[in-house]
Amino acid sequence: MNKQRGTFSEVSLAQDPKRQQRKPKGNKSSISGTEQEIFQVELNLQNPSLNHQGIDKIYDCQGLLPPPEKLTAEVLGIICIVLMATVLKTIVLIPFLEQNNFSPNTRTQKARHCGHCPEEWITYSNSCYYIGKERRTWEESLLACTSKNSSLLSIDNEEEMKFLASILPSSWIGVFRNSSHHPWVTINGLAFKHKIKDSDNAELNCAVLQVNRLKSAQCGSSMIYHCKHKL
């Protein structure tokens, strides 16, 4: 009887294979979860760009700092923009200033060698200037300039006087008077309107340009002279 029961049990198990495949519910859910995690990792490895975008979105949503690479790129971008703005400003602004005579070296640029002036002469506005090195009396200086087809230095306006005083040493100018009782006149016989210092001294009857001012001096003194020739 016992042998029959044992045989029946073995036959029942053989005829019902589904019982052998049945597993506890707990094991089924555990295996399923593990398979899902493996599948998710494989997706992440296959799509690194999507994963990186997801991280950026997480940083943006949570208000956290971006990665160092992103900060470096942003800083370099700002530096490039500043440099480009500086270059554009230089390219546009400098020609504008030069065209409108705002350059600090405007006066120096006006005093340049010109093709219409003899060699070693400079030009300013519409005149050529000879820079003398010899010391002579006022009358000798007048004759020396005449031999150069020019006249002893003359002053037409305040701007010219300031310019010449800034680049030339003290020198005779073509202005004199016969005595302290006579007015100052140019070598062309025209009245000279600019103020000359020490005019009360009767022995000082020739004019000198000296550091942004005009001063009277003895005509027989030896001084440097400069000549002027109008174009």
Swiss-Prot record:
Q: Which UniProt keywords apply?
A: Adaptive immunity, Cell membrane, Disulfide bond, Glycoprotein, Immunity, Innate immunity, Lectin, Membrane, Receptor, Signal-anchor, Transmembrane, Transmembrane helix
How does the entry describe its membrane topology?
Answer: Single-pass type II membrane protein
Listed GO biological process terms: adaptive immune response; cellular defense response; natural killer cell mediated immunity; positive regulation of natural killer cell degranulation; positive regulation of natural killer cell mediated cytotoxicity; regulation of natural killer cell activation; signal transduction; stimulatory C-type lectin receptor signaling pathway
Record region (Disordered): 1-32
* Entry's Gene Ontology molecular function annotations: activating MHC class Ib receptor activity; carbohydrate binding; MHC class I protein complex binding; protein antigen binding; transmembrane signaling receptor activity
- Major location, coarse class? membrane
Intervals, Extracellular compartment: 94-231
Query: Cytoplasmic side of the membrane: what ranges?
Result: 1-70
Organism domain of life: Eukaryota
**Gene3D superfamilies tied to this protein:** Mannose-Binding Protein A, subunit A, YojJ-like
Establish whether keyword Disulfide bond is in the entry.
yes
Could you say which tissues express the protein in this record? Expressed in NK cell subsets, in particular in adaptive CD57-positive NK cells (at protein level). Expressed in terminally differentiated cytotoxic gamma-delta T cells (at protein level). Expressed in alpha-beta T cells subsets (at protein level). KLRD1-KLRC1 and KLRD1-KLRC2 are differentially expressed within NK and T cell populations, with only minor subsets expressing both receptor complexes (at protein level).
Q: Which GO terms describe its cellular component?
A: external side of plasma membrane; plasma membrane; receptor complex
Q: Give the positions annotated as glycosylation sites.
A: N100, N149, N178
The C-type lectin domain extends over: 116-229
Disulfide bonding pattern of the chain = C117-C128, C145-C227, C206-C219
* UniProt-listed PROSITE patterns: C_TYPE_LECTIN_2
Q: State whether it acts alone or in a complex, and with which partners, per the record.
A: Heterodimer with KLRD1; disulfide-linked. KLRD1-KLRC2 receptor complex interacts with TYROBP homodimer; this interaction is necessary for the expression on the cell surface. KLRD1-KLRC2 receptor complex can bind with low affinity to HLA-E loaded with self-peptides derived from the signal sequence of classical MHC class Ia.
Functional description taken from the UniProt entry: Immune activating receptor involved in self-nonself discrimination. In complex with KLRD1 on cytotoxic lymphocyte subsets, recognizes non-classical major histocompatibility (MHC) class Ib HLA-E loaded with signal sequence-derived peptides from non-classical MHC class Ib HLA-G molecules, likely playing a role in the generation and effector functions of adaptive natural killer (NK) cells and in maternal-fetal tolerance during pregnancy.
Q: Per its record, how is this protein called by name?
A: NKG2-C type II integral membrane protein
Q: Highest lineage ranks of the organism?
A: Eukaryota, Metazoa, Chordata, Craniata, Vertebrata
